[in-house]
Amino acid sequence: MSLYRISARKLSEAQKLPNVGAYVRMIAADGKSLRDVLAAKVPQEQERVKNFRKQHGATKMGETTIDMMYGGMRGIKALVTETSVLDADEGIRFRGLSIPECQKVLPAADGGTEPLPEGLFWLLLTGEVPTKSQVQQLSREWAERAALPQHVVTMLNNMPTTLHPMSQFAAAVTALNHDSKFAKAYSDGVHKSKYWEYVYEDSMDLIAKLPVVAATIYCNTYRGGKGSRSIDSSLDWSANFVKMLGYDNAPFTELMRLYLTIHSDHEGGNVSAHTVHLVGSALSDPYLSFAAGLNGLAGPLHGLANQEVLVWLRKLQKEAGNNPSEEQLKEYIWKTLKSGQVVPGYGHAVLRKTDPRYTCQREFALKHLPEDETFQLVSKIYKVVPPILTETGKVKNPWPNVDAHSGVLLQYYGMKEMNYYTVLFGVSRALGVLASLVWDRALGLPIERPKSFSTDLLVKMVQK
């Protein structure tokens, strides 16, 4: 990979990273659009994957056990996802960069410190760190693409406010496929080598429209339909979202930038990411694929964790007060565990240390709301829970994950409607899964079709 131009500020930041050489090579050449950069990358990556498969296509990557098959395919090495890799000790890496590294090198808004999600999307899609001007260009492009077609506006405005926000969200995204460029191109017989270009266009349109859809749902469901639906082209993606939600608070806008960045991607095996990949492999357009992923995200085992943390915290506060002692906390935690429940927000299927997504939210809280009672309670719990979980001997990871903190921050800034939190998660997750979907089509990945077995057949196989 050739060296790209790098500003003095970026070089200074890069020198703080452990792999300076790799980072410098990742700086995008200023002046090029996202599509230009991606178009140059696609043939290079196609050739690299082609040669890699030619040389190592028969290499075995692991074995599958009966328990893996019955256990949600946990641990089976079966998917290729270019955008992120989850390290058990360091947490998620977006194209090789950890969250702290992303916070250092991705462009922030003027006067802000948190990375702009536009920069993260550029990184996920291209593997390169964009310049600030490129991120600003992307913000403007999304603003230009953001308008909703009238049939979707009408549908949203006629949905019952009692309908769950995620149901409204998935329905609206599905309806947006009326204008899918990929679906039209496929119907017109476009060559498969061009699929990625139309998936890219649909993905850009969809990401641009998501804040408008999500804000409309919020205002209709919780604000009696009041609120702005207008996009300000001078604002970034997150700032426009916050404005349309009806909030006018600079720290909350910074929180939203952080939230939308850190929830964007988490490898390809989680339910929402895998669903988008699976449905997209049938050449369903990005709207249908992402809507399917949203329906997976709506499941309580995937997207409701931060709500469960808040419910648990409220029960704790009701029983032990807002400022319980460590002994009171220990007593309540043991009570939770002995009743057969888990402590929500603690543990992770892959991570074996504190989730860096938790850590960056904690750092945000220490900066912006250090005196908040609920944050202080969360800090006490962070001190008390891990030793107790370790003592039980049943938990591989006793440390907090991203969900242990996010709900508390949203509550602090006035967003108390917990049923809406998964919509925020969905807006963020679009960045990762749609970047992956573009690469699925660029690399020509086929329809997904694993082999399944019945229990009777498995019994016969092991008896041989």
Curated annotation (Swiss-Prot):
Task: Give compartment(s).
Answer: Mitochondrion matrix
Reactions catalysed according to its record: oxaloacetate + acetyl-CoA + H2O = citrate + CoA + H(+)
Regions crossing the membrane? none
Extract the SUPFAM superfamilies matched here.
Citrate synthase
Gene Ontology molecular functions: citrate (Si)-synthase activity
Q: Which GO terms describe its cellular component?
A: mitochondrial matrix; mitochondrion
Q: Which pathway does the UniProt entry assign to this protein? A: Carbohydrate metabolism; tricarboxylic acid cycle; isocitrate from oxaloacetate: step 1/2
What other facts are recorded?
Citrate synthase is found in nearly all cells capable of oxidative metabolism.
Q: Which PANTHER family match?
A: CITRATE SYNTHASE, CITRATE SYNTHASE, MITOCHONDRIAL
Subunit structure as annotated in this protein's UniProt entry: Homodimer.
Q: What does this protein do?
A: Plays a role in controlling neuronal activity and seizure susceptibility.
Entry protein name = Probable citrate synthase, mitochondrial
The protein's organism comes out as Drosophila melanogaster
